[in-house]
Amino acid sequence: MSAITITEAAHDYLADLLAKQNTTGIGIRIFITQPGTPYAETCIAYCKPGEEKPDDIALALKSFTAWIDGTSEPFLEDALVDYATDRMGGQLTIKAPNAKVPMVNEDSPMNERINYYLQTEINPGLASHGGQVTLIDVVEEGIAVLQFGGGCQGCGQADVTLKEGIEKTLLARIPELKGVRDVTDHTNRENAYY
């Protein structure tokens, strides 16, 4: 059972497109570029027989096979592919609510959990100042190495944000995390919020 739903309207639209390719056995491949990041993009491409990847998951549909990229599959949880007609013809839409931020649990690796909380709890607040923070690495038995960007780089309040906001939030959510360290070059104050 796949985590992706392809509506009947989308299936019929895609089946029609595939039939026009004049390639026996052609299907589609669904994947995400840069999954789990703010830059994630969900994509559908033609997939001729033999073009599927070894870790792809086959989703057999009525008229064709949809190949789901194995790496992207967890990020495609609750994804919906739909087709809606309009005055201009119609539009294929892909909604993948977990593409940018994967759902994690306490068994997920620490770096995935840190990234999850950075994207869902920390960065939305920093975005109001035009900033963000990124996980660089987890070192020394549980120290998260972070880097500020945008309006946070060079900001005079970065230390307070790091210790009072980010570190407290992450320590409350991830008990085995021991602390955080900032590796940002704050001498560049060109875009700093404060």
Curated annotation (Swiss-Prot):
- Listed binding positions for [4Fe-4S] cluster are C152, C155
The protein's GO terms of the molecular function aspect are: 4 iron, 4 sulfur cluster binding; iron ion binding
Q: Identify the InterPro entries for this entry.
A: Fe/S_biogenesis_protein_NfuA, FeS_biogenesis, FSCA_dom_sf, HesB-like_dom_sf, NIF_FeS_clus_asmbl_NifU_C
Per the record, the GO terms for biological process are: iron-sulfur cluster assembly; protein maturation
Instruction: Provide the cofactor note recorded for this chain's UniProt entry.
Output: Binds 1 [4Fe-4S] cluster per subunit. The cluster is presumably bound at the interface of two monomers.
Cofactors that this protein relies on: [4Fe-4S] cluster
Establish whether keyword Isomerase is in the entry.
Answer: no
Q: Which domain of life is it from?
A: Bacteria
Q: Which UniProt keywords apply?
A: 4Fe-4S, Iron, Iron-sulfur, Metal-binding
Pfam families referenced in this protein's UniProt entry, alphabetically? Fe-S_biosyn (PF01521), NifU (PF01106)
Asked if Transmembrane helix is a keyword of the record, the answer is no
Subunit field text? Homodimer.
- In UniProt terms, what function does this protein have? Involved in iron-sulfur cluster biogenesis. Binds a 4Fe-4S cluster, can transfer this cluster to apoproteins, and thereby intervenes in the maturation of Fe/S proteins. Could also act as a scaffold/chaperone for damaged Fe/S proteins.
The text of the family note is: Belongs to the NfuA family.
Q: Which NCBIfam families match?
A: YhgI_GntY
The protein's name: Fe/S biogenesis protein NfuA
Question: Lineage of this protein's species?
Answer: Bacteria, Pseudomonadati, Pseudomonadota, Gammaproteobacteria, Pseudomonadales
